[in-house]
Curated annotation (Swiss-Prot):
Gene name tied to this protein: mt-cyb
Organism, scientific name: Hypsophrys nicaraguensis
Keyword annotations of the record: Electron transport, Heme, Iron, Membrane, Metal-binding, Mitochondrion, Mitochondrion inner membrane, Respiratory chain, Transmembrane, Transmembrane helix, Transport, Ubiquinone
Protein family: Belongs to the cytochrome b family.
Localization per Swiss-Prot or TrEMBL: Mitochondrion inner membrane
Designated name of the protein: Cytochrome b
KW Metal-binding (keyword) present: yes
Cofactor note: Binds 2 heme b groups non-covalently.
The protein's role, per its UniProt record: Component of the ubiquinol-cytochrome c reductase complex (complex III or cytochrome b-c1 complex) that is part of the mitochondrial respiratory chain. The b-c1 complex mediates electron transfer from ubiquinol to cytochrome c. Contributes to the generation of a proton gradient across the mitochondrial membrane that is then used for ATP synthesis.
């Protein structure tokens, strides 16, 4: 969905809001693509948080190197 949204989105501060409105109003099923993208991203981060919770529950934080790599990957994912 990100590729379809990127074809119509502009990141310029003056036109960003109007490009989102264009996606929702003028692109065929643009509202659906936008909602699927938002819900998919939310579900992705919920899965990441569940994975972190599982690691905390099973004590994986004791493996310092593995845990630090995971934290770095989480921060890179959020950028």
């Amino acid at each position: 969905t990100a590729m379809f949204l990127a074809m119509h989105y502009t990141s310029d501060i003056a036109t960003a809001f109007s490009s989102v409105a264009h996606i929702c109003r003028d692109v065929n099923y643009g509202w659906l693509i936008r909602n699927m993208h938002a819900n998919g991203a939310s579900f992705f981060f919920i899965c990441i948080y569940l994975h972190i919770g599982r690691g905390l529950y099973y004590g994986s934080y004791l493996y310092k190197e593995t845990w630090n790599v995971g934290v770095i990957l989480l921060l890179l994912t959020m950028m």
